[in-house]
């Protein structure tokens, strides 16, 4: 009997502002781990989260592991 893929999966969200910063003036890249429902959100997840390196709320996008 085959098992189905889990509906809820863990995803990693990464700050787009820190990741695309060409000057590398920030000390690091902000990352959050959260869960998403694969059926309800089949596309990549984007949330506004607080980035301690940018010192403000920025868009965090889902990245591949």
From Swiss-Prot:
Give the organism, scientific name: Zygnema circumcarinatum (Green alga)
Q: Which cysteines are joined by disulfide bonds?
A: none
- For this chain's UniProt record, which GO biological process terms are given? translation
| Keywords linked to the UniProt accession | Chloroplast, Plastid, Ribonucleoprotein, Ribosomal protein
Q: Which gene encodes it?
A: rpl33
Which InterPro entries does the record associate with it? Answer: Ribosomal_bL33, Ribosomal_bL33_CS, Ribosomal_bL33_sf, Ribosomal_zn-bd
User: Which molecular function terms from Gene Ontology are attached?
Assistant: structural constituent of ribosome
Does the entry feature the keyword Plastid, yes or no? yes
| Family to which the UniProt record says this protein belongs | Belongs to the bacterial ribosomal protein bL33 family.
Gene3D superfamilies linked: Ribosomal protein L33
| Primary location | plastid
Q: What is this protein called?
A: Large ribosomal subunit protein bL33c
Reading the lineage from the top rank, the first entry is Eukaryota
Give Gene Ontology CC terms.
chloroplast; ribonucleoprotein complex; ribosome
Indicate where this protein resides in the cell: Plastid, Chloroplast
NCBIfam families tied to this protein: PRK00504.1, PRK00595.1, rpmG_bact
């Amino acid at each position: 009997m085959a098992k189905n893929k889990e509906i809820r999966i863990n995803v990693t969200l990464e700050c787009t502002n820190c990741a695309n910063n060409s000057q590398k003036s920030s000390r690091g890249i902000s990352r959050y781990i959260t869960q998403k429902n694969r059926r309800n959100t089949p596309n990549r997840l984007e949330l506004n989260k607080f980035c301690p390196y940018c010192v403000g709320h920025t868009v965090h996008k889902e990245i591949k592991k």
